[in-house]
Every structure is written in structure tokens, then in C-alpha cells.
Regions:
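N-terminal positioning helix adjacent to the helix-turn-helix/winged-helix DNA-binding module
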Residues: 8, 12, 40-41, 104, ...
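N-terminal leader segment of winged-helix/HTH proteins
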Residues: 1-34, 162
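Charged, amphipathic alpha-helical coiled-coil/dimerization segments
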Residues: 77-135
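N-terminal helix-turn-helix DNA-binding core of bacterial DNA-binding proteins
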Residues: 26-68, 152-157
Length: 162
């Protein structure tokens, strides 16, 4: 017999979904006010910049992105149109493509981090002590989130961690 979630578990789920949506909306608004493109652009540029060669196959990029991106090909088209990324044909598999970050893309990603990090502090960091943030990461880890990577990635990249 399958067990139904408790009232408390259901309430936690609802809060988690609402808070995630609201915080993302606030971060998006802060980026827009600062004159930057959407967070998905930053996310894609960050992942491309983290790739050892600065390039990835589109499917790899989609898997790595922090924000679910259901129209990765359209996002890549926009990044290419703006000169932030370029497409490159795969020499081994002529049907395959790579997307690589351009120097302009690297510059934008670094500039966006200033506004993005301020938004993270405003909407998350200022509301949680470091001890609370560690506890929250532990709880999210139990749900399958990878918050355990945060210190390593943040220290390495000076960029938002997962």
C-alpha cells in the first residue's frame, strides 16, 4: 500500500515551490533593472565558461543548466545572434555541433555576476545566517539537491554554485 504524504510534507512542498518561484522572479527583476538579459543567459554562459575548452554540445549544456530550459536551441540562437556564443561543427560527427562561448560572452557573464550576486545576497543571503544556509543545504541535499557542491564551485569560480 502506498503511503500518502503527510500534511506537513505537503505544506513543505508547496512552500518550496512558491519560494523558489518568487525568489527566481525577484532575481530576474533585479537583473532586468540592472539592464541585463534573463538569468537563463547567465546560466548558459557560466556553464560554457566552465567547460574545459569553453564549448559544449547543446544537449550537455541543457543538462548542466541551473534553470530548466525547455527551448535550449532558441536560447543558443539568441546567444549566437548577440555574439555571446558561436556554433562550431563537430569534426568527427558532421551532424553534431558545439556551442562555444565568445570573449564577449565571457565579459557579459562576469558583468552579470555583480548584479546576480547582489540579488542572491538580497533575496537569500540577507535572510539566512551562514548556519541557517548550511542547514537548508543539508535539508535540500536530503531531497536530492546538490547543495553540497556549493563551497567548492563558489570558491573556484566566484560564481553561483548549485
Amino acid at each position: 500500500m502506498k503511503r500518502k504524504p503527510s500534511t506537513e510534507a505537503t505544506a513543505a512542498w508547496i512552500r518550496l515551490m512558491r519560494v523558489q518561484s518568487r525568489v527566481l522572479d525577484c532575481v530576474e527583476q533585479d537583473l532586468k533593472k540592472a539592464g541585463f538579459p534573463p538569468l537563463a543567459w547567465y546560466d548558459a554562459l557560466l556553464e560554457l565558461s566552465r567547460a574545459p575548452s569553453g564549448e559544449m554540445r547543446p544537449v550537455e549544456l541543457e543538462r548542466q543548466m541551473l534553470i530548466p530550459q525547455y527551448s535550449t536551441s532558441r536560447l543558443i540562437d539568441r546567444l549566437v545572434d548577440e555574439g555571446l556564443a558561436a556554433r562550431r561543427e563537430c569534426k568527427i560527427d558532421k551532424r553534431g555541433q558545439f556551442v562555444e562561448i565568445t570573449e564577449t560572452g565571457r565579459e557579459l557573464q562576469k558583468k552579470m555576476w555583480g548584479a546576480y550576486s547582489a540579488a542572491i545576497e538580497k533575496h537569500v543571503g540577507s535572510k539566512l545566517s551562514d548556519a541557517d544556509a548550511i542547514k537548508l543545504c543539508g535539508l535540500l541535499d536530503r531531497l536530492g539537491c546538490s547543495c553540497g557542491e556549493a563551497p567548492t564551485l563558489a570558491a573556484r569560480d566566484g560564481a553561483p554554485a548549485r
